[in-house]
Amino acid sequence: GTGGEFQPLGITKNKGVLNIDVTGLDAEYASSAGVLTAAFPNYLVASVLKNNVYADGLGFVFNTSVEQFFKSLRDNVGSFIFAKEMNDNGTLVGYPYRTTNLLETTGGKSSIIFGNWNDLVIGEQGALEIETSREGSWTDDAGNLISAFENDQTLIRAINNVDTGLRHDESFAVATKVAVPV
């Protein structure tokens, strides 16, 4: 989001977070098309650790296309570089990772986030709001309009306003324009 009212800023749009355009990196880490090398994960880790970040909650987040890309990387003799570690331990270069397709692949490009997830703060605004209605209606799974009034029912809706923020912006880095198989 934009960070405005009712739109969390999140990590990827936070101006204080290191943003790494992988298409501009040295060829040791990525090609100009954004195809990563096996050295890139350690580069991303080092870009965060150089900020003296606590190492108690470090990890990666990327989408499933990035995960499959890393699992398919091979060395010069054809052996998989990361597949065993990722499959057996759920780690990449020794750090845990999680996948989510909320980090989209658009035009064959995606993003990778690395950071100290203990520095991600989740906050609630106010208390849980409860609203009730005896006059409301809803549509059931079959497409029928159901009236609460006609069925002597009360509809209940719970609303909880939640936002995220970073305790230390320097605890995160976002790699962008990462080329992945679509």
Regions found by a protein language model. Name each.
Residues 49-53:
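Surface-exposed acidic, glycine-flexible loop patches that form ligand/cofactor-binding
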Residues 1-47, 179-182:
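Alpha-helical scaffold segments that mediate packing/assembly in large oligomeric complexes
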Residues 11-16, 66-68, 103-105:
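Short, catalytically relevant binding-site loops at active-site mouths
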Residues 28, 36, 74-182:
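Sequence/fold signature of self-assembling virion shell proteins
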